[in-house]
Amino acid sequence: SGITEINPLPSHYVCPKCHWNHFYTDGSVGSGFDLPDHNCPECGTLLYKDGHDIPYSVLFGLDGTNIKGFGLAFVQDAGLDEVYKYMEKLLGREHVLCYGDKLIPGSEKFLKYPDVCKCLNAKDRRWPANSTVRFNYHSIIDDMLSLTMNGNDALTMVHELQNLTGINPQSIPFNDARALSVFCSADALGITPSKLADVIVNGKVTVGTLGLPGYGTPFARGVLEDVQPKNFSELVKVSGFRHGTGVWVNNARDLIKNDTVKIEEVISTREDVMNYLIHHGVESLTSFTVMENVRKGKGIESKRSNHLAELEAAHVPQWFIDSCLKIRYLPPKAPSIFSAMTALRIAWFKVYQPLAYYAAYFTVYAGGAFNATVILNGLASQKQELARIAALKHLTAVDKDNAAMIEVAAEMYLRGMEFLPVSLEKSEATAFKIEDGKLLPPFNCIPALGNAAAGEIVKARNEHLFTSKADLKKRGKVSQSIIDTMEYMGILKGLPGED
């Protein structure tokens, strides 16, 4: 359709040439991406594998009348203006409102309303605040389409990797053994857990997911260590565990650790509940209603219902019922699939194009968290700073961001790669470059130097190279304190004070 990469059909094979196909409708295959490669029995062509088994009713209700919100993720540097213009053209500007009274950069929400609601145009828009409407959200959402548009860092990283390597991320297979292995161990990266533990002193790291969006946090790494996912559908499960409430801790984790069930059976998304019940012979309406109750943390029963008796009559196991009762919020499956697809593509680059991976990661995620005075001084300096942060009783958000950045840098050094010093002649404003087999940091890595100031330096340098510190200060529009920091970092070595 061109709308999304996520195929909601059950897991299946299809021949791209003669269109022979085979569907697995019994729930035995978690994702079409996990199917083994096969050639078409009719014409011999390699079969295409897809399908994630997302019932339409999860989005639109059993009768298809529910109006739900949709999310559009786009690359950060795509530009909000371009996205807005496209939405105006697609939906019609006279039928679109921005809802809420606060605008968050990189995230916008819109309502598409039908022709009969043109009265809103006169009374309830607030110009020039981007056509913002201030109705009570719950009073109108059932009659309008909600569209959320978000700039996405993970997609931006994939885009950056494509630019750096020329490799189309859509050509990367989702069953690559080495890429999948980083979610279980760091072997494919050539690093042992003991080497990582020697540097990262605030917790063990046995998996290779440092820096992978959605799978690199301490919590996510802990889930991966417990689960040891072996295929794509299990990565989707892990993503659901991360986003749900009452889904992993004291629930799915215990079921897996106690060998009650395998990971493929435990609940991690809304679709897991509905599909499991349907495959056990429970009526579609009951399966849907139970799923709706469970996802909202309301248990199994509705008012005047007797769903529990229906589940018991269908021989739904007690562990499943107990698991449903513990859940307070259950996420949808599609965002978990998107998260797993994006992370696995990035993991492929981490294994096969490591320098490009680290360049893209630091370009997208470093921001003000790249402590150049620590990171550029090598592994010993990084280890010392991580130990200092680990010893703090109360970690601030800045401490956590700095630690995450240093951990990825340390991993890079352990894999035999290094940073160059920031170069007055070659560094970019905000992007890390690959130079002579090493990473060249941008100007915004200099402490207290923001993106705008970094851009001014590059703009002035492109006119002609700086001839002195005074020239840099004047044309580059930097303060004396920044000049002092650059001197301390060795960036201005050989540059005279005056012309």
Predicted regions mapped to residue ranges:
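Noncatalytic, beta-rich nucleic-acid-contacting surfaces in large DNA/RNA-processing enzymes
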Residues: 1-499
